[in-house]
Amino acid sequence: MPNTNPVAAWKALKEGNERFVAGRPQHPSQSVDHRAGLAAGQKPTAVIFGCADSRVAAEIIFDQGLGDMFVVRTAGHVIDSAVLGSIEYAVTVLNVPLIVVLGHDSCGAVNAALAAINDGTLPGGYVRDVVERVAPSVLLGRRDGLSRVDEFEQRHVHETVAILMARSSAISERIAGGSLAIVGVTYQLDDGRAVLRDHIGNIGEEV
């Protein structure tokens, strides 16, 4: 899956997910020759910024292979300077045309943030930092009348997209110029489907 443009990149990921959902993955970009060729450098087509949940393995659910995607994962897809730097590297140095924010259902980080807001239950250690970074999305969702857990999970994806735009001029400038797009996706654990929830920039379709 070579470097292309936002529309082609999103199309390739959608088609890969459709193969995965149907149980007909092609496992591309995994041959011995392809692996050896990557030693000279990488040209991924998409950045996946997703949750670190073990059930949400990006290369598998989008049926991609070695060198196809630049993957950054944190619990609850929370953002810090290291995340921003990693994504900006992919965008500015590798010229990746698409960023995918990948959330999912049954997200422990979102559920923990809901528990913290509802009854004051906060975990210890650095897990607390993760929960505190997710909590603003939950509070914004509650302000807007959301009540179901899946609604809060989708809202957190939306807010993550917005934060990337607001905090990184490298991202926002390339989106304005048309060379980059961001999509927000939620992954459904039971059927394996990656559902488009949000996007900024042209990806060839609307939500």
Swiss-Prot record:
GO process annotations (BP): carbon utilization
Cofactor binding, note field: Binds 1 zinc ion per subunit.
InterPro entries: Carbonic_anhydrase (IPR001765), Carbonic_anhydrase_CS (IPR015892), Carbonic_anhydrase_sf (IPR036874)
Enzyme class at the top of the EC tree: lyase
Activity-regulation annotation: Inhibited by sulfonamides and sulfamates.
Alphabetical keyword list: Lyase, Metal-binding, Zinc
Gene Ontology terms, MF aspect: carbonate dehydratase activity; zinc ion binding
Activity vs pH: Active at pH 8.4 and inactive at pH 7.5.
Residue sites binding Zn(2+) per the record: C51, D53, H104, C107
Domain of life of the source: Bacteria
Similarity comment: Belongs to the beta-class carbonic anhydrase family.
Function in brief: Catalyzes the reversible hydration of carbon dioxide to form bicarbonate.
Quaternary data: Homotetramer at pH 8.4 and homodimer at pH 7.4.
Stated name of the protein: Carbonic anhydrase 2
Species this chain originates from: Mycobacterium tuberculosis (strain ATCC 25618 / H37Rv)
